[in-house]
Design a protein with these regions (language model features):
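N-terminal beta1-alpha1 ligand-phosphate binding loop
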Residues: 1-28, 32-44
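Short basic (Lys/Arg) and small-residue
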Residues: 55
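Flexible, gly/pro- and Lys/Arg-enriched active-site loops
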Residues: 11-12, 35, 42-50, 61-143
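Extracellular and analogous surface-interaction loops
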Residues: 58
């Protein structure tokens, strides 16, 4: 099972999540199971609250190809992709507002690391809302 987290804090957040789910289902030829939607404060920067959701599906798409599809959908929904920005003083990654954010959280039981992608996602354990939504969707999947 593959688990993606979706988040939006700009525009019509619920609609952004809906369109992202629809585009992912179309791109992956798979109907996702969806968690509840949870509103959370922005983490790592001052900004509007996020709506977050986790979706799961089965697919044989390769991890890097899945990342490409996710980034294409983010761009289509108005999120530009460029190199991550870092604070020159602290070296910490700078976060920002976004119409949509799609992260691959878990890809089956795969442990994977390249310059572009780490699986499971490094923040899968450190963000309580992600754990909550993962637990919610696993219950819906009867896992």
């Amino acid at each position: 099972m593959i688990y993606l987290s979706l988040g939006s804090n700009l525009g019509d957040r619920a609609e952004n999540l809906r369109v992202a789910r629809e585009l992912l289902a179309e791109a992956l030829q798979a109907e996702p199971v969806c968690s509840a939607v949870l509103e959370t404060e922005a983490i790592g920067f001052d900004g509007p609250a996020f709506l977050n959701q986790v979706i799961s599906f089965e697919s044989d798409i390769a991890p890097e190809a899945l990342l490409d599809r996710c980034q294409e959908i983010e761009e289509k929904l108005g999120r530009p992709h460029h190199a991550a920005m870092y604070d020159p003083t602290t070296g910490r990654r700078l976060y920002s507002n976004r119409t949509i954010d799609i992260d691959i959280m878990i890809y089956n039981d795969l442990e994977y690391h390249t310059d572009r992608l780490t699986l499971p996602h490094p923040q899968v354990q450190s963000r309580p809302f992600v754990r909550t939504l993962l637990d919610n969707i696993k219950q819906r999947n009867n896992l």
